């Protein structure tokens, strides 16, 4: 009663690291002011709120820092590039998402081999220094449907998120063959995975710090999702893409994303074929 809620995009450097780009991404998921019944305030400005346990400065979105309270909402699932007790979830949403491009750059500066440590360290610092009210963790099933929604007090986020991550791992989609000659992917996009296509399913990992999924000799990509707004992160892990994908690529958005996370592999452009048929012919054994 009496609250005046508003929504803040918590997505690090996504959306081309611009306020407008991040708001557009939310709108692509149906998160609009009309649908949600409250304002969406998108900004890349950050404010220092304290230091980590190891002495590093902690910054989060300025509007979030100045709000009376923050409710962190996010999906919990295995990450595409590193392993640890906290992967894609609320701790990462705070450390990198609320930290905007600054937070993303700091957490990625030491590479994915240190990402698990940095997510936990910065996440704990934000819980300590920011006005976090609670967290809302979402776990999906293998069909991208909501399996569980768990509300956690800020004191319980650190304890409960690893348990929800284990549950999410058990219900991840998977391809039941261990290996194949050619893997055909109809669409990739940031709405499916930060890497465009989830390597936990496709096996197309861009770092050596995570593994799993099917082992494909070649990967063929046919299209980008409309929701990804031209961000073709993940094309670099394919063998071949269509001209249709190439013509939609917003390379500036891709490169900002790739440079921020210090991993250029996913932003590379592979062989480009005229149509789906040529893609399949080129990759066929």
Model-flagged regions — what are they?
Residues 6-9, 34-43, 50, 72-73, ...:
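General beta-strand structural signal in soluble alpha/beta enzymes
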Residues 17-22, 51-54, 81-86, 146-151, ...:
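Short acidic, glycine/serine/threonine-rich loops at helix termini
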Residues 21, 25-85:
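An acidic, phosphate/nucleotide-engaging active-site surface
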Residues 3, 10-13, 75-76, 141, ...:
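Short, ordered loop/turn segments at secondary-structure junctions
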Residues 100-102, 147-280:
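Conserved mixed alpha/beta catalytic, RNA-binding, or beta-rich assembly cores of soluble enzyme
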Residues 60-189, 203-208, 212-214:
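Conserved, well-structured core segments that form the ligand-binding/active-site neighborhood
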Residues 282-285:
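Conserved small/polar residues in nucleotide/adenosyl-binding loops
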Residues 3-29:
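Membrane helical hairpin/interfacial module
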């Amino acid at each position: 009663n009496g609250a005046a809620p508003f929504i803040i995009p918590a997505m690090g450097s996504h959306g081309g690291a611009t306020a407008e780009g991040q708001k557009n991404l939310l709108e692509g998921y149906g998160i609009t002011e009309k649908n949600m019944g409250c304002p969406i305030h998108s900004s890349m400005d950050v404010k220092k709120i304290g230091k980590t346990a190891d002495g590093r400065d902690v910054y989060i979105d300025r509007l979030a820092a100045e709000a009376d309270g923050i409710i962190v909402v996010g999906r919990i699932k295995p990450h595409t590039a590193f392993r640890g007790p906290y992967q894609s979830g609320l701790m990462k949403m705070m450390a990198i998402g609320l930290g905007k491009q600054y937070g993303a750059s700091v957490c990625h500066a030491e590479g994915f081999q240190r990402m698990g440590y940095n997510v936990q360290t910065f996440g704990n610092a934000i819980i300590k220094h920011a006005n976090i009210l609670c967290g809302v963790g979402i776990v999906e099933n293998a069909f991208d449907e909501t399996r569980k929604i768990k509300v956690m007090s800020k004191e319980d986020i650190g304890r409960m998120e690893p348990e929800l991550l284990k549950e999410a791992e058990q219900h991840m989609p998977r391809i039941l063959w261990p290996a194949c000659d050619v893997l055909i992917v109809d669409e990739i996009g940031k709405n499916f995975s930060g890497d465009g296509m989830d390597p936990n399913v496709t096996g197309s990992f861009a770092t050596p710090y995570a593994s799993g999924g099917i082992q494909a000799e070649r990967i063929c990509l046919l299209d980008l999702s409309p929701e990804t707004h031209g961000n073709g992160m993940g094309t670099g892990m394919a063998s071949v893409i269509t001209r249709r994908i190439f013509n939609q690529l917003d390379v500036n958005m891709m490169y900002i994303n790739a440079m921020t996370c210090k991993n250029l592999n996913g932003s590379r452009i592979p062989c480009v074929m005229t149509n789906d048929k040529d893609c399949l012919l080129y990759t066929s054994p």
